[in-house]
């Protein structure tokens, strides 16, 4: 499923946020979303699972970001909102049958629960019929 709900609110997956904070190249629509967040014109929810994956990737040296750098970035811009993993999010994820990887399903479940588009470059998530995506 692709695009469009509340035009100024989104959920991000791990790589979307990593690529943005590392100032790596992003497609124009995604760059525009993150630019809007940082100018106060949009909100991006960051699922707890995204932060946990960032910890794991940093510890395994698969990304150059530290958790401290992530925290500083999120604190610098007030329109990033951490979103907790709750039973309601887990229930939303339980309905997603076409994303087999649990962590991805929990991130997609957050977007589904919030009824928001998910910023992701993951082809499995993009192909899902349960969540709308933007990339």
Language model segments and positions:
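Conserved glycosyltransferase catalytic-site signature
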Residues: 14, 48, 87, 104-105
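Acidic catalytic patch
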Residues: 71-97
């Amino acid at each position: 499923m692709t695009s469009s709900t509340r035009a100024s609110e989104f959920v991000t997956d791990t790589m979307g946020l990593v690529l943005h904070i590392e100032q790596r190249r992003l497609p124009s629509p995604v760059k525009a979303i993150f630019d809007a967040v940082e100018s106060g014109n949009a909100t991006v929810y960051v699922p707890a699972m995204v932060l946990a994956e960032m910890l794991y990737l940093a510890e395994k040296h698969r990304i150059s970001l530290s958790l401290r750098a992530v925290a500083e970035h999120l604190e610098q811009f007030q329109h990033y909102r951490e979103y907790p993993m709750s039973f309601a999010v887990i229930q939303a994820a339980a309905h997603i049958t076409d994303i087999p990887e649990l962590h991805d399903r929990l991130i997609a479940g957050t977007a589904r629960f919030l009824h928001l588009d998910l910023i992701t470059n993951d082809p499995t998530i993009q192909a899902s019929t349960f969540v709308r995506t933007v990339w």
